[in-house]
Amino acid sequence: MLPVITRFARPALMAIRPVNAMGVLRASSITKRLYHPKVIEHYTHPRNVGSLDKKLPNVGTGLVGAPACGDVMRLQIKVNDSTGVIEDVKFKTFGCGSAIASSSYMTELVQGMTLDDAAKIKNTEIAKELSLPPVKLHCSMLAEDAIKAAIKDYKSKRNTPTMLS
């Protein structure tokens, strides 16, 4: 059966994903055979989808893409300025199930971490947790690049002198 987009599909993820007549996302039998259950779980029930206000000084935004497959990932972090702890994380991903799952898992992983600890996360950790096949390792690399870009954006906002009128 071909994937369909209905008004019930999750537009926040911007990926064509199969839904049934009731608008419930379903994983096909082919998907279940090709992906680890953790990928399917994060793909069908992604965590922390959405946006934060990028204009806020304590929000960092990382936007990365993979030219090889066309996946694009935006990950945003909200940081407690006094503690350096990531208080909230949101993502939007245009891409395959592995890219969506990698984004979703990354948001769960970094929430509550310090910026230094979050910057140390490697794609291999994500790939191992989700049991990604070698052909999908670029998806976990996107998640690593996205968190590093978000941290860099947050830090650049903190180091920018303010203009006084």
Swiss-Prot record:
Documented effect of changing residue 94 to S: In ISU1(LVF/SSS); no growth and abolishes interaction with both JAC1 and NFS1
Keywords: 2Fe-2S, Iron, Iron-sulfur, Metal-binding, Mitochondrion, Transit peptide
Gene3D superfamilies for this protein: 3.90.1010.10
SUPFAM superfamilies: SufE/NifU
Compartments, record wording: Mitochondrion matrix
Result, substituting residue 141 to E: Disrupts iron-sulfur (Fe-S) cluster assembly
Names of the cofactor(s): [2Fe-2S] cluster; Zn(2+)
GO cellular component terms, semicolon-separated: cytoplasm; iron-sulfur cluster assembly complex; mitochondrial matrix; mitochondrion
Disruption phenotype: Cells deleted for both ISU1 and ISU2 have decreased activity of several respiratory enzymes that contain Fe-S clusters. As a result, cells grow poorly on carbon sources requiring respiration and also accumulate abnormally high levels of iron in their mitochondria. Knockdown of ISU1 in ISU2 knockout cells reduces cell growth, decreases cytosolic tRNA thiolation, and increases association between SSQ1 and GRX5.
Name of protein: Iron sulfur cluster assembly protein 1, mitochondrial
Organism annotation: Saccharomyces cerevisiae (strain ATCC 204508 / S288c)
